[in-house]
Amino acid sequence: MTTTRITLIGRPGCHLCDDARAVVEQVAGELGVGWVEQSVDDDPALRAQWGDHIPVTLVDGRQHDFYRVSPDRLRAALSRPAPRP
C-alpha cells in the first residue's frame, strides 16, 4: 500500500498548477510515493488559506513549495522518512 505523502493544492485552468502536477506525478512515480490533488474551488478553507499562493505542495502535511515545484527539492524532502502519526 502506498502512503500519501504529497498534497497538491491548485485549481482547474491554472497553468502553474499543471506544471506542478507534472513534477509531482514524475517524482511520486519515481519514488513510489502516493499523492492527492485538492482544488481551492471545492473547499472554502483551502481557498482562504492558499488561494493567493497556488499551486501549493505539502509534504507530510507541511508546506513544501508554492508557485513552482523543484523536482530535486521534492525528491530531497521525500528521501527523509515520513513522520510517525
Model-identified regions with their sequence ranges:
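Generic recognition of short, well-ordered alpha-helical segments
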Residues: 19-22, 49, 69
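A short, hydrophobic beta-strand/beta-hairpin element that forms part of a small beta-sheet core
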Residues: 55-63
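Thiol-based oxidoreductase modules, predominantly thioredoxin-like and allied folds used
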Residues: 33-44
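Compositionally biased, disordered extreme N-termini, encompassing classical targeting presequences
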Residues: 1-5, 82-85
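Non-catalytic, surface beta->alpha helical segment in thiol-disulfide oxidoreductase systems
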Residues: 62-85
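Short Fe-S-cluster ligation motifs
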Residues: 42-55
